[in-house]
Amino acid sequence: MSCLTWNCRELGNLHTGRKLMEIVWAKDHSVVFLVETLTDEARLEFIQNIIIFYHRWVVSRVGKSGGLILYWRSSIYLTIKGSDKNYIDAVIDKDLESEWCLTGFYGEPETTRRNEAWDKLRSLSSRPERPWLCYGDFNEIIR
């Protein structure tokens, strides 16, 4: 299974949609998490159709910023556990035996609010022990 994350900085842009299609088709990704989609539901559905994914979970943008989407193929057994403006959290049960967690994360771009996003991530990390992949745009430089 291959997972892709991308801060696409406006999925409404034709060039961005075309590039996403090329990447997904070239690497045969199973799950795609996009941040800063900055677009409407109709465009997100259009993108879903051109990359040939059958499922999606959307967190709408707030004003003129943000927006998250998780696309996944029909062959993936994925259940959404929660979402908000900073994350989409899911459980994947690929072969009905080996359950694992997947969190697409978007760190707060506003520096004064970053602790809120990190607190959410800490809360998600405190679940019962099972493998966990957390990926995305953390908007943070780790030294």
Give the positions of each predicted feature.
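Short phosphate/oxyanion-binding micro-motifs
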Residues: 1-134, 141-142
